[in-house]
């Protein structure tokens, strides 16, 4: 496990096999971007949580990942209280409503003089669920206390760089993480009278 303590090495979102059961210590320090829901808009709290869980699982590779809970909460909170824009996408064959939520969370944490966008490239993640496609475009900054670092300095979160390195491939092969996670969450039941 010394590969996670190298100096001048970016520790990114850890793969699912690095679970240590310390979900409470995982913190999203900063996040910015937008969530686009194309199709059925989530209206109830249950639907917003359902959409958030699917999107978070698609980003971190499963619901067992240490940062799954905090990411789900962040997305659900933005869908519930964040600013919203709704428009119709006329560029498709079947025009579907497109709802956009602005994700913005920040604390007074300064790594260096460089702003967040210079450190972490924009990533796009997309997942399809019942009647909708959810896409997040943005960047995250996580605390490093859950990835085996010596100190609590923040590390960059993303899915490039580390996942393409030889060290990651060796660890991935050793832990046999080639199997894809097939995640299914129960869709919330519709309430009301059927016509």
Swiss-Prot record:
Function description:
The M protein has a crucial role in virus assembly and interacts with the RNP complex as well as with the viral membrane.
InterPro entries in UniProt: Rhabdo_matrix (IPR005060)
Q: Is the RNA-binding keyword given for this protein?
A: no
Q: Name one Pfam family in it.
A: Rhabdo_matrix
Record-level Gene Ontology MF annotations? structural constituent of virion
> Which pairs are disulfide-linked?
none
- Member of which family? Belongs to the novirhabdovirus matrix protein family.
- Protein name per UniProt: Matrix protein
Compartments where located: Virion; Host cytoplasm
State whether it acts alone or in a complex, and with which partners, per the record: Homomultimer.
At the top level, the lineage of the source is: Viruses
Q: Where is the signal peptide?
A: none
> Transmembrane stretches, by residue range?
none
What's the main place this protein lives? virion
A cellular component term from Gene Ontology for this protein is:
virion component
**Which gene is the coding source of this polypeptide chain?**
M
List keywords of the entry alphabetically: Host cytoplasm, Viral matrix protein, Virion
